[in-house]
């Protein structure tokens, strides 16, 4: 098994230089003669964490986020993401919905799972005072409803998930 950069692993397979290779699910729709796709169930998790504290600067570094500091905003984001759609379109159907960092582990709390509910997400954002502006971005006291999503360089799956998350949340005005 070769653990290489995703593109390098695919190139090694295409050049017949590898018998087995681990690569991104974005390549799962390609059929390569002499190879078959094998899905392996793991506890690998591609999620993100939101800052829970107000924004502050210490030693020149900004911590927290005024928008995501509100628990109802975090709840709205959680129910405003269509995980099934992401699995289908980003992961080519290879994946399971994730709700915490310990899904499928013995100590996982099933109450962490939520249903996709964009209407309830909008209601939570409105109740929290984040109103939709003419430009399609919510604001509260002049502050934009926004946060930064970071992902590892070279991880096309995390990048695609981050972009898809941003597109889904844009529909909610985030």
Predicted regions and their residues:
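Flexible, glycine-rich active-site loops centered on histidine and acidic residues
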Residues: 96-103
């Amino acid at each position: 098994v070769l653990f290489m950069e995703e593109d390098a692993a695919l190139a090694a397979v295409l050049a017949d230089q590898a018998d087995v290779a681990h690569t991104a699910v974005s390549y799962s729709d390609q059929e390569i003669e002499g190879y078959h796709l094998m899905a392996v169930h793991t506890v690998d998790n591609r999620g993100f964490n939101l800052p829970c504290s107000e924004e502050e600067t210490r030693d020149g570094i900004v911590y927290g986020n005024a928008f995501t500091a509100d628990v109802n905003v975090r709840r709205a984001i959680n129910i405003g993401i269509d995980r099934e759609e992401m699995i289908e379109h980003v992961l080519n159907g290879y994946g399971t919905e994730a709700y915490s960092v310990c899904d499928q582990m013995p100590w996982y709390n099933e109450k962490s799972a939520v249903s996709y509910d964009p209407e309830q997400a909008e209601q939570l954002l409105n109740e929290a005072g984040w109103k939709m502006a003419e430009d399609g971005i919510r604001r509260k006291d002049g502050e934009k409803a926004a946060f930064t999503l970071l992902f590892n360089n070279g991880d096309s799956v995390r990048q695609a998930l981050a972009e898809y998350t941003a597109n889904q949340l844009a529909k909610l005005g985030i």
